Amino acid sequence: MRLELYDEVALLFHSEEKDIYFVQHMIKNIFCIKKIIRNRQDLQVYELLKNHPHPNMANVIDFAYSHDKTIIIEEFINGCTLDFRISQRPLHPKEVESIMLQLFSVVSHIHKLHPPVIHRDIKPENILIYQGHITLIDFEISKRYLPDCVDIMKCGSVGYAAPEQYDGRSNQQSDIYAVGILLREIVYASEQTEPMLSILHDIIHTSTQIDETRRYQSINEMKKEFLQRFHHRKW
């Protein structure tokens, strides 16, 4: 990675864990995002994401270690967070459907990689939305799913992290739990909360079971039931 080619235009975010810059490639004249993360990330996750892009995921352009920090260059994505969007006005049921189908698609994509990638921090703040198109971002605590490996650290966001994540375990069902919590949140932020809850309650209930073995065993199983209950309804 030739970091000197990326001119730092603005600091977008600063914390103890990371800095995020809006940068410009001085030769290609394109704008990107540069993340400086103050620990060593699993670069094999970024290798998988770079080699297997998806329309609802920011493209990974480059990555490297530098002085015990991880540097990630990603595609710049326009838009606001889903968290901000739902604070502005209620969602129409068709918007809820569109958001969820896009989310199912990208989560299914990362879960089907070899090995699967577990996001571990799916929440409205980590989803950008622009003109109805969503982008799942922030893979900093994501991991490759290796069945016999225990997580080194407990991670995730309170309210969205599955119970097993607090015990140092995470798998595909952990992401399904977070998707279920997110579904519940955007249903409550919709124009027609009560009728939507009546058809989606069982999906939310199943996906957010404390016992991970009682959740959907794949995100596509959850998507299939969502479509059966939600699709072709007139709102």
Map each language-model feature to its residues.
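Conserved HxN/HPN-centered segment at the entrance to the catalytic loop
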Residues: P53-D62
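Conserved short submotifs of the Hanks-type protein kinase catalytic core
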Residues: H67-T81
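AlphaC helix of the protein kinase catalytic domain
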Residues: L82-L91
